[in-house]
């Protein structure tokens, strides 16, 4: 059977009942997923604008300063991981298939490192192993993916590390930035504590 909900609310449907979760979460600033699958979503009667507001990692958000998406993505994925660990049985396994790198205005950010740091920092998961794979896209470019295997450790771990992790990645990115790009990164760091997660999408908001 299929159950539809915001990923950050998964535990409300599947609490402590799952042995294995395999998923490929969104990446920072890559697609607007609701647009890529718009035709299907409209056939099913979903409200596209409500879905768009809650989408994780969307490049549509924060158009005035896209580096704020790095922070919002980290917060959203922290909430998602906190929900998924509560879905898993003790020692259950979570496998994340992650596009290794995203670019925001030409500045690279490691999706894999951000997610792994969030997963391990709050004590919810232990890393089991990581693998990598590569494929050639239609433009002839090599695309690397990391396969991160995590074991559920603590369903009640406190998840409060995402802001600090985002801050460190943004600070590190300044070494590759200049001009207005560097200015936007610096501005994001200065307001980082005021950036909120994406709004949760309730079941009522889907249709």
Locate each region found by the language model.
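Class I S-adenosyl-L-methionine-dependent methyltransferase catalytic core
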Residues: 1-95, 99-207
